[in-house]
């Protein structure tokens, strides 16, 4: 560059793109990585508890029932499966009737 201002004549674009192979010849055993990741996730979930608010329907009168539970992520998933299955929660008004 000569002078105070840049002109198009001063810019030289002589670079061309180089093709680069993106394939790698390294072999990884994915089953070992999955096991390590799964164990780390389970260990983290086992020690970390959290409050979960649950709103469901009474098994007798279909009114809304609110629950707050303190459990781990895997426990709340298990509770979710139970609520979708045969487990029914009953409201305080219907509880004496059962």
UniProtKB/Swiss-Prot annotation:
A motif (LXCXE motif) lies at residues 22-26. GO terms for cellular component: host cell cytoplasm; host cell nucleus. The keyword Metal-binding applies. Coiled coil: none annotated. Residues 1-41 are annotated as: E7 terminal domain. It is found in: Host cytoplasm; Host nucleus. Highly phosphorylated. The keyword Transcription regulation applies. A zinc finger (unnamed) spans 58-94. A motif (Nuclear export signal) lies at residues 76-84. It holds the Pfam family E7. GO terms for molecular function: DNA binding; DNA-binding transcription factor activity; protein domain specific binding; zinc ion binding. GO terms for biological process: DNA-templated transcription; symbiont-mediated perturbation of host cell cycle G1/S transition checkpoint; symbiont-mediated suppression of host innate immune response; symbiont-mediated suppression of host type I interferon-mediated signaling pathway. Keywords: Activator, DNA-binding, Early protein, G1/S host cell cycle checkpoint dysregulation by virus, Host cytoplasm, Host nucleus, Host-virus interaction, Inhibition of host innate immune response by virus, Inhibition of host interferon signaling pathway by virus, Interferon antiviral system evasion, Metal-binding, Modulation of host cell cycle by virus, Oncogene, Transcription, Transcription regulation, Viral immunoevasion, Zinc, Zinc-finger. The E7 terminal domain is an intrinsically disordered domain, whose flexibility and conformational transitions confer target adaptability to the oncoprotein. It allows adaptation to a variety of protein targets and exposes the PEST degradation sequence that regulates its turnover in the cell. Plays a role in viral genome replication by driving entry of quiescent cells into the cell cycle. Stimulation of progression from G1 to S phase allows the virus to efficiently use the cellular DNA replicating machinery to achieve viral genome replication. E7 protein has both transforming and trans-activating activities. Induces the disassembly of the E2F1 transcription factor from RB1, with subsequent transcriptional activation of E2F1-regulated S-phase genes. Interferes with host histone deacetylation mediated by HDAC1 and HDAC2, leading to transcription activation. Belongs to the papillomaviridae E7 protein family. Homodimer. Homooligomer. Interacts with host RB1; this interaction induces dissociation of RB1-E2F1 complex thereby disrupting RB1 activity. Interacts with host EP300; this interaction represses EP300 transcriptional activity. Interacts with protein E2; this interaction inhibits E7 oncogenic activity. Interacts with host TMEM173/STING; this interaction impairs the ability of TMEM173/STING to sense cytosolic DNA and promote the production of type I interferon (IFN-alpha and IFN-beta). This is Protein E7.
């Amino acid at each position: 560059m000569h002078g105070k201002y840049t002109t198009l004549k001063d810019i030289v674009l002589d670079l061309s793109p180089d093709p680069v192979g993106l394939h790698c010849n390294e072999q990884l055993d994915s089953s070992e990585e999955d096991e390590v990741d799964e164990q780390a996730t389970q260990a983290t979930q086992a020690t970390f508890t959290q409050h979960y608010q649950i709103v469901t329907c009474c098994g007798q009168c279909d009114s809304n029932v609110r629950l707050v539970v303190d459990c781990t992520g895997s426990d709340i998933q298990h509770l979710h499966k139970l609520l979708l299955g045969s487990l029914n929660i009953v409201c305080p008004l219907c509880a004496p009737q059962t």
